Amino acid sequence: MATVKAVCVLKGEDPVKEPVKGPVKEPVKGIIYFEQQGNGPVTLSGSITGLTEGKHGFHVHEFGDNTNGCTSAGAHFNPPGKNHGGPQDNERHVGDLGNVIANKEGVAEVCIKDSLISLTGSQSIIGRTMVVHEKEDDLGKGGNDESLKTGNAGSRLACGVVGIAKL
């Protein structure tokens, strides 16, 4: 059974340096590692720093294009054309990985196992963009059209392209 590994370096925009009292907030950044054995689930591990405390939407977006920042990454990766949902839902985008949770220091430790994304084949996320969002993903339960598209997760704080890693 072959093992495939990948990595994603998340980088946020530099914060606006305004004349305010207090420390300047560091940009959001992180490293996420992916591993898949055969056709099994993909395990994601790593950490993200510079977040506000609480939940932040975490998704795979359709394009590996970051030429215009995280906006160039397009919508959530969704080849079957389904509505947005949570990682445990049958009705969800392939790229819907739910939320990461940042502690009071702004650090989110990522430990996710997902059976819908893949590092090979038609559901492969290789060459696509991972995005961490400003707000909590409502998992498609927000009761409005935007919830069924994005989970009302807000702006894109940091992103990076998923690439094959050395075994």
Swiss-Prot record:
Cofactors required: Cu cation; Zn(2+)
GO CC terms: cytoplasm; nucleus
Localization per record: Cytoplasm; Nucleus
Binding site for Cu cation: H59, H61, H76, H133
Listed PROSITE patterns: SOD_CU_ZN_1, SOD_CU_ZN_2
Lipidation (S-palmitoyl cysteine): C8
Sequence repeats, residue ranges: 15-18, 19-22, 23-26, 27-30
Function of the protein: Destroys radicals which are normally produced within the cells and which are toxic to biological systems.
EC number assigned by the record: 1.15.1.1
Disulfide bonds: C70-C159
PANTHER family attached to this UniProt entry: SUPEROXIDE DISMUTASE CU-ZN -RELATED (PTHR10003)
Catalytic activity: 2 superoxide + 2 H(+) = H2O2 + O2
Cofactor binding mode and count: Binds 1 copper ion per subunit.
Name of the protein in its database record: Superoxide dismutase [Cu-Zn]
Pfam families: Sod_Cu
SUPFAM superfamilies reported in the protein's UniProt record: Cu,Zn superoxide dismutase-like
Modified residues (Blocked amino end (Ala)): A2
